[in-house]
């Protein structure tokens, strides 16, 4: 469909570039689970180099698409889950980590696109999940069976969900005693029974019905094809459940995901900035104003702001550490600096 096609094209680039020898070093990695070459978007970070290459990869893809390519949220959710399941098993003697590794092997073998499903619709922000007027405002377990669990709720602003094979559901906030039903992490196919996806409106989306003229980034669109995903009594077998009731790990889980995700911004946002800066320079050239001192100052400032964001992402990657689980985790403080600079600099650049 013309209103969805650009987002499909953008996600497809994460597959096409992985098959291009020119970009193989950034787009692929060696799985520590199987020893095979896998798409980096399905990889669990095994070194500082992996963390750095993630940022460089994202800048490169963004330079080619000028938009969101949608696999980053799932990528970060998988890496956060790898650490969290290990830590839960260590404390409680559960078997989440082995389950997760088995599922990760399946994801890698099939190069699946995973949507990270964290953000709930939330309702009254002053109340914890178990105190909401409507229990479905946060995703939660409504039934435990011998063969699995049944969940209800909704996940909002789901980047890339419409193009993904599966979603990795995780908590969205710190949880307290009484919130056990909301401490759920699991993997679910996007077309499982009981799931409805509501595709969000996009800027100038109806113009695409008339062709490519005046539609902005007509090939790849401008955002990530977000959905509101409703979960209406969705069954999840136990071998796809990676947290169930461990409220004391929810906050750390969310924090790890957030740090990994903030690391990205100095990659993808800077790649998008590269496109904008290049276009601005070209427009100035066509108008005969590129040598004007004011224009040169503005372009220089745009480059400075973009490279500052990139430096922050590289810094939090190079300062990463090896976790007891065996994977590598970014420096949280510096990852937060990425976020702070990006939320300011992107607006100044544009």
Please identify what each model-predicted range represents.
Residues 111-124:
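A short, Trp-centered hydrophobic/proline-enriched beta-strand micro-motif
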Residues 86-93, 120-122, 297-301:
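Conserved short loop/turn motifs at secondary-structure junctions
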Residues 8, 75, 97-101, 135, ...:
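Alpha-helix initiation and N-capping motif
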Residues 1-43, 50-61, 264-350:
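Alpha-helical interface subdomain recognition
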Residues 19-114, 166:
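Internal helix-loop-helix
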Residues 121-268:
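FAD-binding core of flavoproteins
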Residues 12, 101-108, 139, 146-148, ...:
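Short, well-ordered alpha-helical packing segments
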Residues 95-106, 221, 238-265, 281-304:
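Well-ordered, non-transmembrane segments within structured domains
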